[in-house]
Amino acid sequence: MPPTIHRNLLSPELVQWALKIEKDSRLTARGALAVMSYAKTGRSPLDKRIVDTDDVRENVDWGKVNMKLSEESFARVRKIAKEFLDTREHLFVVDCFAGHDERYRLKVRVFTTRPYHALFMRDMLIVPTPEELATFGEPDYVIYNAGECKADPSIPGLTSTTCVALNFKTREQVILGTEYAGEMKKGILTVMFELMPQMNHLCMHASANVGKQGDVTVFFGLSGTGKTTLSADPHRNLIGDDEHVWTDRGVFNIEGGCYAKAIGLNPKTEKDIYDAVRFGAVAENCVLDKRTGEIDFYDESICKNTRVAYPLSHIEGALSKAIAGHPKNVIFLTNDAFGVMPPVARLTSAQAMFWFVMGYTANVPGVEAGGTRTARPIFSSCFGGPFLVRHATFYGEQLAEKMQKHNSRVWLLNTGYAGGRADRGAKRMPLRVTRAIIDAIHDGTLDRTEYEEYPGWACTSRSTSPKCRSIC
């Protein structure tokens, strides 16, 4: 018997279905949908595959990040997913857009058995108007999310019962063996990392905001370095928190929502994000008080990688059409695990390329399935290594060209640890200090001061200004 197909339900309808058919889904005290992704609470990078087709073979940087899957194996994986989806009682279909700049917008269609996943993608992508839905037509990319169904590890190219496969030729993503919703949004980011360079545009794993004078700041960084928190600035307008493209006209957000780490979320220092976790939002793997339904943002008993997803409309001052000009400031966020880096450093063009391609940060516990429980230094090219398709130097050259053309200033900001190692009890940089530094970047204070080379770090420099040092 074919499934009952629920096509493009509204968010309240998806919430109702989740409460009806998902045994562990419930509403929080403020109306967000609390859900579980079960066994996988983070991305599965070891199970990511890109299909080896003739149209992308020469472009892809094959290796540990981009592992090959043959077209024959992909066909078998796709068959498993489609057969599973076709035999469920309920099938949810979501049509959305990726990309606020309509010149480069993708039409995305998602098939999933979980209303939580459907609501997540409505939150994360751009929801069409009724008129746009009426003329949506065939999608540019299709996501078959059969995460409740396990993959067959005997299929050549697979090594486990999880598979997250992307086929650029057929324009499809297949998900098996993981119910972690983040795999869908990162799949779209990977697609853009291949499509945008074909038009000489830079895809960025970065957040962005814009000031009242139109000055744009882009924040590069891996999960947990502060992209979402720092871009949600009450004095500036949010463009987006994670995925952007820098074109010949400026910056646009790929997404229509935010996906924030929730562990340790403080309603006083991160009020914008806290207030966004209301009806229509998704609280993923968060622990609720059984009596009150309040989220305990400090409870790690399910996982460290607790998440909240919400539409941009939940953030006061966020741009509804998330497009802005060329960046005045580019900030690299690094979570230094050893406490040896300065709170902030200004970079020359050459230094910026070094740090961008190197992508030093620290592993944030819980972001990847099976990840370490303690912070350790890692190097993730372009501050987005897991999502790059081409070689890192390709994106580095793109960034250098754009920064030079538009005279962008570049900064390295340590949002990690100060005064010692993370695994020896050191405290993380206070958020108020980091925000004060960013304010000093935006008002020009850090740009109007003399700098000196930072001992032991020939590629960085720090301000000699007493005012700046008092902040840091």
Swiss-Prot record:
It catalyses: oxaloacetate + ATP = phosphoenolpyruvate + ADP + CO2. One of its GO terms (molecular function) is ATP binding. One of its GO terms (biological process) is gluconeogenesis. It holds the Pfam family PEPCK_ATP. Its EC number is 4.1.1.49. Homodimer. PANTHER family: PHOSPHOENOLPYRUVATE CARBOXYKINASE (ATP), PHOSPHOENOLPYRUVATE CARBOXYKINASE ATP. Belongs to the phosphoenolpyruvate carboxykinase (ATP) family. This is Phosphoenolpyruvate carboxykinase (ATP), glycosomal. It comes from Trypanosoma cruzi. The lineage of its organism: Eukaryota, Discoba, Euglenozoa, Kinetoplastea, Metakinetoplastina.
